[in-house]
Structures are given as C-alpha cells and as structure tokens.
C-alpha cells in the first residue's frame, strides 16, 4: 500500500474552498466494500497520474480520448499528466501515455459540483486489445434499481490515507435523481439534474476513484464525482450523468 497521507492533505487544503456546503468531493477515488478485479474485466479503466502517483480515474472513450471529472483537473497542466492504461495495477504494467490537452466542461462549478466532467486527449493513439478497450457512452439513463459497477484504485474507507495497488470494483444500484434528492437520503436540493446517484449499503466509490467509470449494461452511465463520506447509508455516491452530457462529450472529443 502506498502512503499518500501527505498528498491527500495537500489536495484537501488546495480544494477546501471548493467543497459544496460541507460535502466532500471524492477526490482521487476509493472503493468501499468492493472486491479485487482485473483490467480485463474493466478494460476501459485508466489511472490519471502526476509525478508518479495515481490521483484520479478515467474511462477510455476512443483511441486517443479519455473521459474524467472536471474537479480532477483544476490547477493542473497537461504536461504534468500521465495516463496508465491496460493494467490491473496503477504502479506498473500496461503502458503510460502523455497528455496533449484537456478541456473541463465550461459550466463546471466547484461549489455545487454541477457539470463535473472533462475530456482528455492522449498524445499517442492507444492500441486496443483485451486489456485496453473503449466503453460506449449512455444516451439515456438506466432504470431505477439497475445494477451498475464502479471501479478504481481509491481508498477503501472514508478518510483513508492509503490506496490499493490492485484494481477494485463494487456493485451498486442506480438511484433515480428524484429519489436521491428526496427525504430518504440526506442531500436534498444539492442533487442537480446533471447528476446521477448509485447506492448499496456500506458500498461506494471513495477518495481516489474520482473521474472513474460507473458502468451499467456495458455503457458508461456515470463519472465518479462527489459524496458525503464513503459508504454512508444516508448518502449515495454522486456521479456526473453521462447521458446528460452525451452530445457535449461527442463534440468536445472532436475539438479538444
């Protein structure tokens, strides 16, 4: 396990002013209550890295495009970014690629976390194989209760200071936006129409999983965005709603 307490502290301090109404964005991703998996089961999964350390996840959209969260790329230069693909382990294996450019959604708001999505263009084209594949993006939301899987190298407990070397995944259920903002859970009006929720008791994404994929029916339906703690029964994980951004993703992938 890699000790990253200092890194997490720096990130928390740097972004303290952007936390919406006391809620903690899932910076750097985490999987709580999950299981070890392999990149062959999630070949679209990538690790975003700076200075040799994993800090966010992402999803392969095409041979040279990755989808991630806008909050992952605040105050970041493209020249400092690397993306590891095709490996179950964020520290080794697969291949590492430089980043040519990226674009955050122009409507991203760090206080409310709306439009928390970004497009990254890799410097060189990826060679697809069993461990490196693009994922199709959703053009409509999955039904309430549909099974979904989120994967990543995030911490395994809320506030954790270590991240696993091995890729983890957890199975969740989709929660309709109207239900997610209802009194059943604790978010209320903080849940916006650009967001999607997913939930299972004591299971969740966590710090370090940010930007990573939520997949249902072999489609990318969500991008790990934020939440209150990790695995809290009152607070589902909150994701950028990929179907809502379908046209933006297609357009920006051509332009970035």
From Swiss-Prot:
Database matches in Pfam families: Trypsin
Signal peptide (UniProt feature, chain positions): 1-22
Active-site residue numbers: 71, 116, 210
EC class name: hydrolase
Domain of life: Eukaryota
CDD domains xrefs: Tryp_SPc
UniProt-recorded Gene Ontology molecular function terms: serine-type endopeptidase activity
GO cellular component: extracellular region
Biological process, per Gene Ontology: proteolysis
Gene3D superfamilies recorded: Trypsin-like serine proteases
Catalytic activity: Preferential cleavage: Arg-|-Xaa, Lys-|-Xaa
Transmembrane portions of the chain: none
Site (Required for specificity) location in chain: 204
UniProt entry tagged with the keyword DNA repair: no
Entry's family note: Belongs to the peptidase S1 family.
Protein name according to UniProt: Trypsin epsilon
């Amino acid at each position: 396990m890699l000790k990253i307490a200092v890194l997490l502290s720096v990130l928390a301090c740097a972004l303290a002013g952007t936390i919406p109404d006391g809620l903690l964005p899932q910076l750097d991703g985490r999987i709580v209550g999950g299981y070890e998996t392999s990149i062959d089961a999630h070949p679209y999964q990538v690790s975003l890295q700076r200075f040799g350390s994993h800090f966010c996840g992402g999803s392969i959209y095409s041979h040279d495009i990755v989808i991630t969260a806008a909050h992952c790329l605040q105050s970041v230069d493209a020249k400092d970014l690397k993306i590891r693909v095709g490996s179950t382990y964020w520290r080794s294996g697969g291949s590492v690629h430089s980043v040519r450019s990226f674009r955050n959604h122009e409507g991203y708001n760090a206080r409310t976390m709306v439009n928390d999505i970004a497009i990254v263009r890799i410097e060189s084209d990826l060679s697809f194989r069993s461990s490196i594949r693009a994922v199709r993006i959703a053009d409509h939301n999955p039904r309430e209760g549909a099974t979904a899987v989120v994967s990543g190298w995030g911490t395994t407990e809320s506030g954790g200071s270590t991240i696993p070397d091995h890729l983890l995944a957890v199975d969740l259920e989709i929660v309709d936006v109207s239900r997610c903002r209802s009194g059943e859970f604790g978010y209320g009006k903080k849940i916006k129409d650009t967001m999607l929720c997913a939930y299972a008791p004591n299971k969740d994404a966590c710090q370090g999983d940010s930007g990573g994929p939520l997949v249902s029916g072999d489609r990318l339906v969500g991008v790990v965005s934020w939440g209150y703690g990790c695995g809290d029964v009152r607070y589902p994980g909150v994701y950028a709603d990929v179907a809502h951004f379908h046209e933006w993703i297609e357009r920006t992938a051509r332009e970035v």
